Amino acid sequence: MFGVAKPPPSPIPKPPRGRHFGEKYPESVNFPSRGARQRASTRHRPSIKEVWEPPAPPGAGMIFWGENGENGDFGQSAPSCYERRRARSQGGQGAENAAPVLRPGPEGRRRRESLIFLEGDMVRETATVAPWTVSPLRPERPKSLLGRFRSRLTVWREVPRTPGPVAPIPELPGEADDPPTRTPPPPPDD
């Protein structure tokens, strides 16, 4: 009956207008305007399809996702965004580096996804190895030493170049096609 007059309700406290919120998108933080989205997307970001389905060089292999090679499994077996950018950046350094060469790993529980980059006669293979897979660097290494989580291994090995037309072997000195080094003796007179 003898109530005290309530103070006027205070306005809802607003979040601090920081550098990354109020100054850039004052009207909506989480949903920037269309113009802001267009300005932010001026730099081309390649999609997964652009990176993983380039025109393959001759002799390129396949890519196996999933336990037995099912495509479309972009879970743990998918490479990270950093790896995709690295594959894109290293893919344009030469004719044979036009695209990352993707090879299938062993099927079954010894599955391994690999990214392979051609570098001259050598290949750098960055493999995501499941914890139950033995190390390709030391096959005698016990499986338990790889730990519980997936490991990153970089393997260097020599590989033959892409098969192509074989260049003819040059003739060595002293072959039949070479000019004679001295004049033959005259035939005997009868």
From Swiss-Prot:
Residues 36-46 have a biased composition (Basic residues). Residues 1-15, 162-171, 181-190 have a biased composition (Pro residues). It comes from the Viruses. Residues 1-110, 160-190 are annotated as: Disordered. Signal peptide: none annotated. This is Protein E6C. It comes from Equine herpesvirus 2 (strain 86/87).
